[in-house]
Amino acid sequence: MAERGGAGGGPGGSGGGSSQRGSGVAQSPQQQPQQQPPQPQQPTPPKLAQATSSSSSTSAAAASSSSSSTSTSMAVAVASGSAPPGGPGPGRTPAPVQMNLYATWEVDRSSSSCVPRLFSLTLKKLVMLKEMDKDLNSVVIAVKLQGSKRILRSNEIILPASGLVETELQLTFSLQYPHFLKRDANKLQIMLQRRKRYKNRTILGYKTLAVGLINMAEVMQHPNEGALVLGLHSNVKDVSVPVAEIKIYSLSSQPIDHEGIKSKLSDRSPDIDNYSEEEEESFSSEQEGSDDPLHGQDLFYEDEDLRKVKKTRRKLTSTSAITRQPNIKQKFVALLKRFKVSDEVGFGLEHVSREQIREVEEDLDELYDSLEMYNPSDSGPEMEETESILSTPKPKLKPFFEGMSQSSSQTEIGSLNSKGSLGKDTTSPMELAALEKVKSTWIKNQDDSLTETDTLEITDQDMFGDVSTSLVVPEKVKTPMKSSKADLQGSASPSKVEGTHTPRQKRSTPLKERQLSKPLSERTNSSDSERSPDLGHSTQIPRKVVYDQLNQILVSDAALPENVILVNTTDWQGQYVAELLQDQRKPVVCTCSTVEVQAVLSALLTRIQRYCNCNSSMPRPVKVAAVGSQSYLSSILRFFVKSLASKTPDWLGYMRFLIIPLGSHPVAKYLGSVDSRYSSTFLDSAWRDLFSRSEPPVSEPLDVVGRVMQYVNGATTTHQLPVAEAMLTCRHKFPDEDSYQKFIPFIGVVKVGLVEDSPSTAGDGDDSPVVSLTVPSTSPPSSSGLSRDATATPPSSPSMSSALAIVGSPNSPYGDVIGLQVDYWLGHPGERRREGDKRDASSKNTLKSVFRSVQVSRLPHAGEAQLSGTMAMTVVTKEKNKKVPTIFLSKKPREKEVDSKSQVIEGISRLICSAKQQQTMLRVSIDGVEWSDIKFFQLAAQWPTHVKHFPVGLFSGSKTT
């Protein structure tokens, strides 16, 4: 609650009112009906909480809360008949203090054993057995769950001046509270409190005088409707001597019927059923601090009218249509009853009006939409870890051009709109010619499993917003493979972009790099999928062939597969390996997009969950082989970290990932330094030469399947790679929108480069990763000077290889460097920078200069199996003159040294990198996936959840942790 309740004290009280946070309502004496005789109070309904009583004075109660303002609670209390100060007069019987209080406390949804229940308590009498405090003229009765911060207090109860007193009460507490089924944490505390005082002045806060405990588990099993005496003790340890007693009239704990409540009250948002227990009490931010709940109720009914007006406009089905099958059955039964024709009426429909028929047709349309959204399969799209695309969209103007950029808030809406426009002919003649060539290749392959989704894959590319007249498609048609249809999508999918190369490249550049490049017009006018590579995949649907391959592997709930091989088939290398494995009937799943990777891993996690439910023994780790580039492994890592964050830590041992590199792969290179058998299998020259070609070989030069299965069968040891965190602050395309943040896990290398405005060329080296992010240069590339020097002095971290080559771009307006400010903190006081830097490791260190490149690695040193808790950074700077700045390491200049110098800083626990000029946007590559329009980013050496390591399988004889 955002405001303090304005409740006043009873007659003769302090008059200060309740100072606790909450909301209350008080009725004036003129509006109250005649007082009824005392009787047990029923629990107040959650929505229309109302209490009536009669008296010359009333006051409101407040629900105290010390939690955050995001949780909602409401307390309604009416007090009457408070005894006057000084006790009752002669011959008069004091009227009982009457109050009705209601509150809703939040439920811990992370625990499956926590359920909401409604607790009702009626207090009849307060007996003070001992004098607890001098000058005690008023007390407050409060209830609180043990271990919780929420407190529900009554108004001040005025006590007579005499010491030992009996006060008649008629207090009713109705609490919706979280009940834990599997632990002893259901103790309700009934406390006797008074206002705190300082030098005879009342101050904020309450002092607890006595406490009594009620076991809610016993109340749930044995409700009490008779007289019950609860002793209150000033010392919890000494329960033999009570200082006060409270007589309880009724005591009960009842379950909450959410279905009955929701059948009477309409939902107010499309996704209200996601959290059905608490959403019924939610108000908008403007009304959360209101002291008048009736005002909130009026707004609720106004919102009901608005929903009726907008019924025809809102066609998005709520998430309950996906997750709750009983609702669909109820709708269907209700519709069948409406269509049932009685014998008296006959078969004539003349009495049915057109309006009724139109209303039934609308209901049928909504039902069909619900049935289409609901997918009962165990490995279907409902298990995907995608962002919510069914939330209420912000009103925005539709872009004039279909392929132009949208903000991330509009990407969700556009993804739904694109589904309805799959049949539109929006392709240009050049695109049609390219698509015809691709389609002819598919027909030649005679692949029946792919013919059903030809149209879907073409339109999926349109949904990425990256189709243009310069799309490089015909080059890939040279190589007809089984899954060659995915190449069309591979040239546009941003999660598979492994470099920043453009079509104007050297002939020595591998075909894979040229095919995965994007034209300049696309990079400058692309959609949000370029800025956020995983946003564009929310519109995709996994192909039918993916589910067919999964069904062949996941055959039974009683047994788990020993291994699953995931292959990235967006390029010829993956298609080549997949075809060889499929010929020998290996458990292969061909994936072409991030959403398909998520679908496969979701199905695997679901099957592991079913196995655990059916078996008492722990499952053995399932080997998941990832055949592809570093960016492909990054998509698997992101889903792994996100999915297992909501599961218990023992799930971290249920899967073991096997990395099979196709092309340059920094993580695989580190694994080869730890495991010599792994290095000889996947890092030898024969393997590299095979997959660095521009086209697949005519004959098989080496036993690819034998090497893969040798690794799959022999990887019996788990090596834990630490998972680091990258927080990216991205700029929206629209200037009036605020920036947003993305949290990306990574295990390899993060590289920083300048946003290019012109085409650039890329050198090709065997040791440099394909994903090397380049900085524009005003000089032509030099293969003999700069790159060699950048990695020679001082020796860089072996895990970073030699990917510090500076690539030139003569037309770049920024020159060959970028001004950056890098703030970093060292992890341990004992770790210092190389070359003997003596600065304090616990303080912030800053590098502020012009950089040619910045690269941060989370991988340990080559050959070191011992994991470190820090990162290593390699920077290449440009020297303005012969004088070395004080912030850099001092060294003697070489004779043939160019105007750059390399520096390695180790032991970094946290790092923040930003451009010197605010208008300069950065481009960041994280484990091979490129992210653009970055204002600044922050790196942390450890991922914040319990998923802190990525389990990788190695051969048994390797040096593992």
Swiss-Prot record:
<dbReference type="Pfam" id="PF25332">
    <property type="entry name" value="C2_PACS_N"/>
</dbReference>
<comment type="function">
    <text>Coat protein that is involved in the localization of trans-Golgi network (TGN) membrane proteins that contain acidic cluster sorting motifs. Controls the endosome-to-Golgi trafficking of furin and mannose-6-phosphate receptor by connecting the acidic-cluster-containing cytoplasmic domain of these molecules with the adapter-protein complex-1 (AP-1) of endosomal clathrin-coated membrane pits. Required for normal ER Ca2+ handling in lymphocytes. Together with WDR37, it plays an essential role in lymphocyte development, quiescence and survival.</text>
</comment>
<keyword id="KW-0007">Acetylation</keyword>
<feature type="compositionally biased region" description="Pro residues">
    <location>
        <begin position="35"/>
        <end position="46"/>
    </location>
</feature>
<feature type="modified residue" description="Phosphoserine">
    <location>
        <position position="428"/>
    </location>
</feature>
<dbReference type="GO" id="GO:0044325">
    <property type="term" value="F:transmembrane transporter binding"/>
</dbReference>
<keyword id="KW-0597">Phosphoprotein</keyword>
<dbReference type="GO" id="GO:0072659">
    <property type="term" value="P:protein localization to plasma membrane"/>
</dbReference>
<dbReference type="GO" id="GO:0002260">
    <property type="term" value="P:lymphocyte homeostasis"/>
</dbReference>
<feature type="modified residue" description="Phosphoserine">
    <location>
        <position position="532"/>
    </location>
</feature>
<feature type="compositionally biased region" description="Basic and acidic residues">
    <location>
        <begin position="260"/>
        <end position="271"/>
    </location>
</feature>
<feature type="region of interest" description="Disordered">
    <location>
        <begin position="260"/>
        <end position="297"/>
    </location>
</feature>
<feature type="modified residue" description="Phosphothreonine">
    <location>
        <position position="44"/>
    </location>
</feature>
<feature type="modified residue" description="Phosphoserine">
    <location>
        <position position="28"/>
    </location>
</feature>
<feature type="modified residue" description="Phosphothreonine">
    <location>
        <position position="502"/>
    </location>
</feature>
<feature type="region of interest" description="Disordered">
    <location>
        <begin position="475"/>
        <end position="540"/>
    </location>
</feature>
<feature type="modified residue" description="Phosphoserine">
    <location>
        <position position="379"/>
    </location>
</feature>
<feature type="compositionally biased region" description="Polar residues">
    <location>
        <begin position="404"/>
        <end position="426"/>
    </location>
</feature>
<dbReference type="InterPro" id="IPR019381">
    <property type="entry name" value="Phosphofurin_acidic_CS-1"/>
</dbReference>
<keyword id="KW-0175">Coiled coil</keyword>
<feature type="region of interest" description="Disordered">
    <location>
        <begin position="375"/>
        <end position="426"/>
    </location>
</feature>
<feature type="compositionally biased region" description="Acidic residues">
    <location>
        <begin position="274"/>
        <end position="291"/>
    </location>
</feature>
<feature type="modified residue" description="Phosphotyrosine">
    <location>
        <position position="249"/>
    </location>
</feature>
<feature type="compositionally biased region" description="Low complexity">
    <location>
        <begin position="20"/>
        <end position="34"/>
    </location>
</feature>
<feature type="modified residue" description="Phosphoserine">
    <location>
        <position position="526"/>
    </location>
</feature>
<feature type="modified residue" description="Phosphoserine">
    <location>
        <position position="517"/>
    </location>
</feature>
<dbReference type="GO" id="GO:0034067">
    <property type="term" value="P:protein localization to Golgi apparatus"/>
</dbReference>
<feature type="compositionally biased region" description="Gly residues">
    <location>
        <begin position="1"/>
        <end position="19"/>
    </location>
</feature>
<feature type="compositionally biased region" description="Low complexity">
    <location>
        <begin position="51"/>
        <end position="70"/>
    </location>
</feature>
<dbReference type="Pfam" id="PF10254">
    <property type="entry name" value="Pacs-1"/>
</dbReference>
<feature type="region of interest" description="Disordered">
    <location>
        <begin position="758"/>
        <end position="802"/>
    </location>
</feature>
<feature type="region of interest" description="Disordered">
    <location>
        <begin position="1"/>
        <end position="70"/>
    </location>
</feature>
<feature type="modified residue" description="Phosphoserine">
    <location>
        <position position="529"/>
    </location>
</feature>
<feature type="coiled-coil region">
    <location>
        <begin position="351"/>
        <end position="375"/>
    </location>
</feature>
<keyword id="KW-0333">Golgi apparatus</keyword>
<feature type="modified residue" description="Phosphoserine">
    <location>
        <position position="527"/>
    </location>
</feature>
<feature type="modified residue" description="N-acetylalanine">
    <location>
        <position position="2"/>
    </location>
</feature>
<protein>
    <recommendedName>
        <fullName>Phosphofurin acidic cluster sorting protein 1</fullName>
    </recommendedName>
</protein>
<dbReference type="GO" id="GO:0030137">
    <property type="term" value="C:COPI-coated vesicle"/>
</dbReference>
<feature type="modified residue" description="Phosphoserine">
    <location>
        <position position="377"/>
    </location>
</feature>
<feature type="region of interest" description="Disordered">
    <location>
        <begin position="76"/>
        <end position="95"/>
    </location>
</feature>
<comment type="subunit">
    <text>Associates with AP-1 and AP-3 but not with AP-2 complexes. Interacts with FURIN. Forms a ternary complex with FURIN and AP-1. Interacts with PKD2 (via acidic region). Interacts with SORL1. Interacts with WDR37.</text>
</comment>
